[in-house]
């Protein structure tokens, strides 16, 4: 799946724990680009030195790719049965266990492979923090720090120009990242997918702030935020309404509505992939290491 902070820290912890416990009796195979590498047999024999100096590195030394779970049972353009190919390569490599790092789709595929008889240890990775079985996923806290820093920086220009600013935070279906960053950054309004918003309430809050002498407002908006009107539609119509939106994202629609209702200049900032890039923070380095050590012990 998508990259995030803490992947290399987790990989490092798995490897170093195995080397410390088993020494030369362990052989670690790196699967290139995630499930894609396991499907097409793209691997790399790893050495202890491959794991040095990567604790603080963002991204992943093994690469990654998106292999949607819903397509795992669908043969590819070359008629390759992906599940059977992964099982075949697992056995061909002589693996004792497959260690998987990923979010919802990755976890579903990991469980599918388990049901097919493979030994799998799967660790929770996502900046969305939306996986069952753990309070925190690695990558989440680092993304919170970055999104919070964006909100902090926007505050100064918002106050200087007397504008409304919308910071669009990653999160199509869940609002953990937006909620945490919004609270930490002191956002005046926070909109998340789980709670459909009422644009009239948003406008009322902004007007109330203006009447109270506040010439600016900061909104933290999840990319998956949705209005009450659209949320009330049947699923098929709801998807069509979102697809037909004339703006690049929901934040621009909200900005238009605010500007039209208040007359106050409204701007949108989209930090995008900045949120999942760069070095993991201290918390993610620790939790990634703990996850990796436990995976090796299992």
Predicted regions and their residues:
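Accessory alpha-helical/coil subdomains and C-terminal extensions
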Residues: 89, 100-102, 108-112, 119, ...
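A glycine- and small-aliphatic-rich helix-loop capping segment at beta-alpha/alpha-beta transitions
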Residues: 12-21, 44-50, 112-122, 138-142, ...
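Short, ordered loop/turn segments at secondary-structure junctions
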Residues: 1-2, 31-36, 66-67, 103-106, ...
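Glycine-rich oxoanion-binding loops at beta->alpha junctions
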Residues: 38-98, 138-149
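N-terminal phosphate-binding or glycine-rich loops at protein starts, especially the Walker A/P-loop
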Residues: 1-42
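C-terminal non-catalytic interaction/assembly regions of soluble proteins
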Residues: 246-298
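Short glycine/serine/threonine-rich phosphate/pyrophosphate-binding segments
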Residues: 3-14, 38-39, 83-84, 97-111, ...
